[in-house]
Swiss-Prot record:
Signal sequence interval, chain numbering: 1-20
Cofactor note: Binds 1 zinc ion per subunit.
PANTHER family to which the protein is assigned, alphabetical: ADAM A DISINTEGRIN AND METALLOPROTEASE DOMAIN, DISINTEGRIN AND METALLOPROTEINASE DOMAIN-CONTAINING PROTEIN 28
CDD domains assigned to the protein according to its UniProt record, in alphabetical order: ZnMc_adamalysin_II_like
Record key words, sorted: Cell adhesion impairing toxin, Collagen degradation, Disulfide bond, Hemorrhagic toxin, Hemostasis impairing toxin, Hydrolase, Metal-binding, Metalloprotease, Platelet aggregation inhibiting toxin, Protease, Secreted, Signal, Toxin, Zinc, Zymogen
Propeptide stretches in the record: 21-187, 390-407
Catalytic activity as recorded in UniProt: Cleavage of 3-Asn-|-Gln-4, 9-Ser-|-His-10 and 14-Ala-|-Leu-15 bonds in insulin B chain and 14-Tyr-|-Gln-15 and 8-Thr-|-Ser-9 in A chain. Cleaves type IV collagen at 73-Ala-|-Gln-74 in alpha1-(IV) and at 7-Gly-|-Leu-8 in alpha2-(IV)
Misc note: Pro-atrolysin-E can be enzymatically activated by venom, atrolysin-A and atrolysin-E itself.
Organism the protein comes from: Crotalus atrox (Western diamondback rattlesnake)
Name of this protein: Zinc metalloproteinase/disintegrin
EC numbers for this chain: 3.4.24.44
Cofactor: Zn(2+)
Active-site positions on this chain: E330
Pfam family, one: Pep_M12B_propep
Amino acid sequence: MIQVLLVTICLAAFPYQGSSIILESGNVNDYEVIYPRKVTALPKGAVQPKYEDTMQYELKVNGEPVVLHLEKNKGLFSKDYSETHYSFDGRKITTNPSVEDHCYYHGRIENDADSTASISACNGLKGHFKLQGEMYLIEPLKLSDSEAHAVFKLKNVEKEDEAPKMCGVTQNWESYEPIKKASDLNLNPEHQRYVELFIVVDHGMYTKYNGDSDKIRQRVHQMVNIMKESYTYMYIDILLAGIEIWSNGDLINVQPASPNTLNSFGEWRETDLLKRKSHDNAQLLTSIAFDEQIIGRAYIGGICDPKRSTGVVQDHSEINLRVAVTMTHELGHNLGIHHDTDSCSCGGYSCIMSPVISDEPSKYFSDCSYIQCWEFIMNQKPQCILKKPLRTDTVSTPVSGNELLEAGIECDCGSLENPCCYATTCKMRPGSQCAEGLCCDQCRFMKKGTVCRVSMVDRNDDTCTGQSADCPRNGLYG
């Protein structure tokens, strides 16, 4: 369903800018206040959906107008997504909540091919976007008389502490048959792999967030939304298979010694979790402070192994992006990726697999990471990530909306307010060329040569053909 929502955001012109404020993301020294005003263009008589499939936001950043394009992350959850918690008497309670109409988006800034965005629209707009090479955060302000939001640069958030944050993995990379350049991989969609991810939240996290399971759930969903974007350009699709919250106490000994915690968690996954929940990889999200400034640890090349397809990650920052990048890093180890060296590059940024986690983390993998990941996959051939899992949004509905594009169906119509596609027939509306895709804008193919995906490794950017809504893959992406 392609639905355009235009929200005009006006920049406040009084003393909020430049002052200091404590937000959910931390103590921010310089920020702007903006006010979303929704202007909806819907067909006459159409019903406003709770969360549109696509949205556009018009806003001012540093006094300049920009347009933020967002698209719902339809492949965020696997079909059998589940949530588990424990009652006060220790009973395991598992549900399969409906997550088809979720509120998590990814996107880009108009006329900025290097831009990215990861946004939650659950309660206002919360997340981050990159504009002209600078990372910005946005979140609602808790003001009773308005819908004010704060927008600020990530670098303007005060450091939570000065200690370096480290990954606990120390092994060196030993290549199988070294590939000299990432471009030698010649990856294409046939190489696509799929990781069904299960995240366990320990009791310390449950206590840290005052037993607010909804807040914990949203934090995890936001993290996976970020992780999915980073792995997309590696031809690896991340789907969230489930969440388990240890609400009545830890089921393993979570301790400051990260090797011991990782070992215990791996054993628990093998003997308990795998017997009751199908998934490919499990990550423990904990509030405990590990020894030696370590914030994460994982088994290198452990993917698909009952015990070793695991990692442990400290919830070390109020900024969800930083924790999400840490979990992306640890999952990278499970996929055979080692730490970057000085010769590795992802286009001038601090890359995901840096052994020291930056306060301004990157969502990009380096050229070395591509080589190591796909050398591992091609040589070790892990089987669990080969099969494409069903997604929540591929469930059949009375009016198509299932993305399968069966015979005779021209578009994924979804619902009645789709401006590009008839919901009753799943045929294109007159004048429409497309309904979705990186090279589709307002139901029309974007011009030939329009950059639709930026390569951070070899600068061989992907561009639209002018004949399709799809963005063809040419380059390699960090």
